Amino acid sequence: RQILHYCVGMEAIHVAYEKDGQLDLNALAEVLNDQIACVLIQNPTFFGSLETQGQKIADRAHAVGAKFAVYADPASLGVVAPPVQYGADIACGDIQPLGIHMSYGSGLGGYLATPVKAEYVLNYPHHLYGIFENDAGERGYFRSLPERTSYYRRAQGVEFLGTCVGLWAITAAVYLSVMGPQGMKDLGETILKKSAYAKKMLSQIPGVRLLFQPSTAFQEFVLNFDESGKSVSEVNKRLLEDHKIFGGVDLSKHYDLGQSALYCVTEKTSQEQIDRLCNALKSILA
């Protein structure tokens, strides 16, 4: 929805997904033609499942001359293959999971990764820093091709770029340097274990059904309450009023999934919190 409002003159086509949350390759084939500029997927998907058909999607996109872009959660990349390994031309996402605390809608900043080619780099709207070396072997740094940037274009800029974004980028860089490759792997494995535990416990509650099986979920997963006879809004109201718990995101307003809600765990979610949610739902749905 944000893309539709952000990029004037561009048509966004939504492609159907299978019951397990994977992209419907037949539906993708029906919309692909030489007028398609790019195929964009989110991995993990909005519903939390890991898309395992990345290379097939990339091959189909490239066959019609389109680029293949992947919106990837950086917290998952310690345990999930990076987009470049399954054919992505562009990788992008948000750096918020990298040690940045949410604060009144802030704490957000995007990352963008492409091959070092002019067709990509010259379209970057942000500052690009170059390095040069003088005769004495001293290094200097400079802003390269500033006319590309929204900072240079001012009123004609196409996105927000402020000091806070740079500060969040520094925070994310420090977080990554401290964590290192092993730390990011440990982070991903911790989230996977907690997600698996939460799904196992919640799916055992009468009236609760786990959707998009048997796909592996990373952080998010979808719970359906149709069998309980209660709506998501009812469940969320009781969770908040009786147990001081914020319920899952109500998907019934935008997706044909019945009374379903999107839940999420992170590395900071404790087993005690998961058990507390389970007990609360048991009492609400009893």
Tell what function each PLM region has.
Residues Y17-Q22, P44-E51, A69-V70, A81-P82, ...:
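Hydrophobic alpha-helical scaffolding
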Residues R1-G140, P146, G229, S233-R238, ...:
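Conserved PLP-enzyme active-site core in the AAT-like
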Residues Q182-R276:
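Conserved C-terminal alpha-helix-loop-beta "cap" of PLP-dependent enzymes
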Residues P97-P206, L210-P214:
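Active-site C-terminal subdomain of aminotransferase-like
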Residues A29-E30, G54, Y151-R154, D250:
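Glycine-/acidic-rich phosphate or pyrophosphate-binding loops and their flanking alpha/beta elements
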